[in-house]
Structure formats: structure tokens, C-alpha cells
Design a protein with these regions (language model features):
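N-terminal strand-loop-strand beta-hairpin
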Residues: 1-153
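Acidic, proline/serine/threonine- and glycine-rich low-complexity intrinsically disordered segments
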Residues: 155-157
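Conserved small/polar residues in nucleotide/adenosyl-binding loops
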Residues: 159-165
């Protein structure tokens, strides 16, 4: 499996803590490159795929340490960039593979047609094709949220602190 796992921890915070962190972080860190100038955040819409038994959802709710999710993502309600993603979680480590989709390819996926994925040479196209054909994955859930992400270079990688604002 090509790629590099990254460490990911998530914490729930209350509104007051959010504003304190936001104030402190904005003085020390840069906003993520995807942030809109006028608001400092960006909108994410994800369409998740699952099987008829909702296996991916069940493993998430159960808190299983190893699981995967397949999704299509757009940013700021625009379809100029459409990403097909496979996210694998093993304990607190995350591996994400992503490839671009055209609007036409996205529409084909919505119709259950995925053979075009075999022509793509980037991960996760093959894994998504396999999952749709052999596990019966189909689009099931849309999730919208707004992200305020700060970035700080550490060695070669980046640390992202995401503050969901909705």
C-alpha cells in the first residue's frame, strides 16, 4: 500500500474554548491554503459510500480501531475540483489516497457505473471499483461542514488544526 500514515487526534471543545484557541492560533499559525480570504474558512461537502448493511457506519459508531471510508468531496460548493478519496484508519494513524474526478465521472458513479475507474492509474480508483463491484458500495450520505484549518510546517510535513465552525 503506497503512501504514508499520519497521526490524527480529534477532540471535542466547547464554543468558548474554540474562540480562545482561534485567537491564539491565528496569531501563531497560517491559515490553510484553501481558506477563503473573506471568512478564513472553507466549506466541505462529502458524499460517503457504504454497503446495504451500512458496514462502514457501523464500524465507525462501534469505535473500531481499523476501518476505512470511501467518499467524494467538493469544496466551497463548487465542482471545479472533485476528489475521490479512500481514508484508512488504523488506531490513531490515517492513510488517505485521493484522485480527481470530472463532473461526468462523478455522475457515472452516482448511477453505479464505475468501470471508468479501471482506466485511472492513481489510488484509490482501483479500491473504489473493487468495493463497488464486490461489496455493493453505493452513495448513501452527504455530510456538510465548514472547516477553519491552521497550518504549521514541522520538518517535511504539516500539522493541521481544524476548527469546525458548524
Amino acid at each position: 500500500m503506497a503512501g504514508k500514515f499520519r497521526h490524527e487526534l480529534k477532540f471535542y471543545i466547547n464554543t468558548a474554548t474554540y474562540y480562545v484557541l482561534r485567537h491564539r492560533l491565528s496569531a501563531l499559525l497560517s491559515l490553510d491554503e484553501n481558506a477563503r480570504e473573506e471568512t478564513g474558512d472553507y466549506h466541505i461537502r462529502s458524499l460517503y459510500f457504504d454497503d446495504r448493511e451500512d458496514s462502514n457506519l457501523v464500524t465507525k459508531i462501534a469505535g473500531e480501531d481499523s476501518r476505512e471510508k470511501l467518499r467524494v468531496r467538493i469544496y466551497n460548493m463548487e465542482d471545479s475540483v472533485i476528489r475521490l478519496e479512500r481514508k484508512i484508519k488504523k488506531d490513531q494513524y490515517i492513510l488517505k489516497h485521493s484522485c480527481g474526478l470530472t463532473r461526468k465521472e462523478f455522475e457515472l458513479l452516482m448511477e453505479g457505473e464505475c468501470s471508468f475507474l479501471l482506466q485511472k492509474d492513481k489510488l484509490p480508483a482501483g479500491a473504489v471499483y473493487f468495493s463497488m463491484k464486490n461489496k455493493g458500495l453505493r452513495p448513501v450520505k452527504v455530510v456538510d461542514y465548514v472547516r477553519e484549518a491552521y497550518v504549521h510546517p514541522i520538518a517535511v510535513s504539516y500539522t493541521h488544526l481544524t476548527l469546525p465552525t458548524t
